[in-house]
Amino acid sequence: MGVPLPIRMTVLRLDDGDLLLHSPIRHDDRLRRALERLGRIRHLVAPNSAHWMFLPDWQQHCPDALTWAAPGLRERRPVKKASLRVDHDLGAAPPAAGTEEIEQAIVPGGFGFAEVAFFHRASRTLVLTDLVLNLEPAKLPPLARPLARLTGTTAPDGRAPVYLRWVIGRKREQASRAAARLVAWNPERVIFAHGRWFERDAAGALRRSLAWLLPG
């Protein structure tokens, strides 16, 4: 959108006690130590082509963590230039391979875009990245508020920004099937990278946010 946005990292604690960091934010020693008190940081996830830039620092401080990246991310020129190590490409199998605690779906788009969505079964939490923006105007720069409202990305009825809807529309049929799967999971909460997450009536809010993409 061309303006600074509030950003969120989501942390999942897996059945074995290890932590999965989804879309890691800027590394901070205090934050890392707080997380390490909760469990071993084992998985670092870059869920789409826009959410990877802080990963090199996390890799440096968590050398034993595995890095998982959205399909095609490792081939992008900025990623290669940054020397980001990608251990695994996200595909049909989730990072917690061999377990049934996480399901995932790939929402594809044109120009090499793909966003990988995660559903944590135990907490019934759907973790997205940019597929929904639900920005709170009070937390945006004053000049950015009209633009956010114009693009339909403000709370409580946020959705994907216009440019991303256009990109995803390039593979609408496949993306529509993936969106239907997200809704079918019937999540109790939906967390995403930007804005107020869906804490109540999450399934209904998700359906409204994805109405532009859902079949029919």
Residue positions per predicted region:
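Catalytic core of the metallo-beta-lactamase
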Residues: 1-26, 30, 82-150, 177-184
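Short, surface-exposed connector motifs at secondary-structure boundaries
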Residues: 15-18, 36-42, 187-188
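Active-site neighborhood of phospho(di)ester-bond hydrolases with catalytic His/Asp-centered motifs
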Residues: 21-23, 42-49, 68-70, 127-130, ...
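Cap/insert and terminal regions of metallo-dependent hydrolase folds
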Residues: 25-26, 43, 54-57, 61, ...
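Active-site HxH/HxHxD metal-binding segment of metal-dependent hydrolases
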Residues: 33-98
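Short active-site segment of divalent metal-dependent hydrolases/proteases
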Residues: 51, 133, 197
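Residues at the C-termini of beta-strands that transition into short coil/loop
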Residues: 71, 108, 154
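Residue-level detector of flexible, active-site-proximal loop/helix-junction positions
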Residues: 74, 111, 197
